[in-house]
């Protein structure tokens, strides 16, 4: 079965009954060797719909940049959460992602009744929550969160690229590409690199 066929067969999402305010939560940046893992939480306004919401990875940069301010303007509430590279090294990437999600939800200026989390794990939260596999494709609130998180982190990588142009962060966004491997082999690591990740440990000689 192809990936495309799988996506067509995703079951429609049924929102849990008895709740009014749903926050969608997603993360960007679990895989990169550098920078924070960034999360977003979004509560959409059912009376102010946003066209074109889907998984941020399926959108062009231009479309994400167009949707980003529209989500910020039309959502009832949105918030960012993050865990920096040093926190990822202390906690591990899974736990750091959970903490970043908790921070995003805590930052909302409206408290949701229910949190819908992309993936298969729910962090400890003060409200009910549900993990939704492929949630960024199935749940609009999660789609919106994925766009907010993706645009935010990509912009951070573009800023980091200005400070360290030799690494090519604007292009690969910190992910473990051949160009990134070659750059850290040649130039070493910077403070934003995740020292617990194997390719970085190898360059540091601590593997």
From Swiss-Prot:
> Required co-factor?
Mn(2+); Mg(2+)
Q: Which PROSITE patterns match?
A: RNASE_H_2 (PS51975)
Q: Where found in the cell? A: Cytoplasm
Checking Gene3D superfamilies in the record gives: Ribonuclease H-like superfamily/Ribonuclease H
- Positions of the RNase H type-2 domain: 20-207
A single GO cellular-component term on record: cytoplasm
Question: A Pfam family name for this chain?
Answer: RNase_HII
Query: According to the record, how does the cofactor bind?
Result: Manganese or magnesium. Binds 1 divalent metal ion per monomer in the absence of substrate. May bind a second metal ion after substrate binding.
User: Which InterPro entries does this one have?
Assistant: RNase_HII, RNase_HII/HIII, RNase_HII/HIII_dom, RNaseH-like_sf, RNaseH_sf
Q: Which UniProt keywords apply?
A: Cytoplasm, Endonuclease, Hydrolase, Manganese, Metal-binding, Nuclease
**Catalytic activity annotation:** Endonucleolytic cleavage to 5'-phosphomonoester
Please state the protein's primary subcellular location: cytoplasm
Q: What is its EC number?
A: 3.1.26.4
Domain of life of the source: Bacteria
Example of a GO biological process term: mismatch repair
In alphabetical order, the GO MF annotations are:
manganese ion binding; RNA binding; RNA-DNA hybrid ribonuclease activity
Family membership, please give it: Belongs to the RNase HII family.
What does the record give as the function of this protein?
Answer: Endonuclease that specifically degrades the RNA of RNA-DNA hybrids.
Checking PANTHER family in the record gives: RIBONUCLEASE H2 SUBUNIT A, RIBONUCLEASE HII
Q: Which HAMAP family match?
A: RNase_HII_B (MF_00052_B)
Q: Tell me the protein's name.
A: Ribonuclease HII
Source organism of this protein record: Aliivibrio fischeri (strain ATCC 700601 / ES114) (Vibrio fischeri)
